[in-house]
From Swiss-Prot:
The keyword Cell membrane applies. Coiled coil: none annotated. The keyword Cell membrane applies. This is UPF0060 membrane protein Swit_0423. GO terms for cellular component: plasma membrane. Belongs to the UPF0060 family. Its main location: membrane. It comes from the Bacteria. The chain crosses the membrane at residues 6-26, 29-49, 61-81, 90-110. Keywords: Cell inner membrane, Cell membrane, Membrane, Transmembrane, Transmembrane helix. It is found in: Cell inner membrane.
Amino acid sequence: MPGAGLFIFVAAALCEIGGCFAFWAWLRLGKSPLWAVGGVGLLILFAWLLTRVDSAAAGRAFAAYGGIYICASLGWMWAVEGGRPDRWDLIGVLLCAVGSAVILLGPRTA
């Protein structure tokens, strides 16, 4: 799962974050309600992408994805919103990335 799975997780994270941000922009930043239409589309794509990950259990896929989502969220904050992560953000991201790696790469019995 590492190569393609990681790509799918990152794509899913960008879709989820973009979809949620579309609602944030509409409801918190005063953007047009049309932002919500795009947001819904991205959230549907996000959900579909998670079903493409090679995992026997949805819960394991979702748990591993959670760490990727947290990393991507702070990247979004920095790249899109201009907010720079502080040291506590970075420590938290590191812990989440390690947790996701353990879930993704840990040996499994057949």
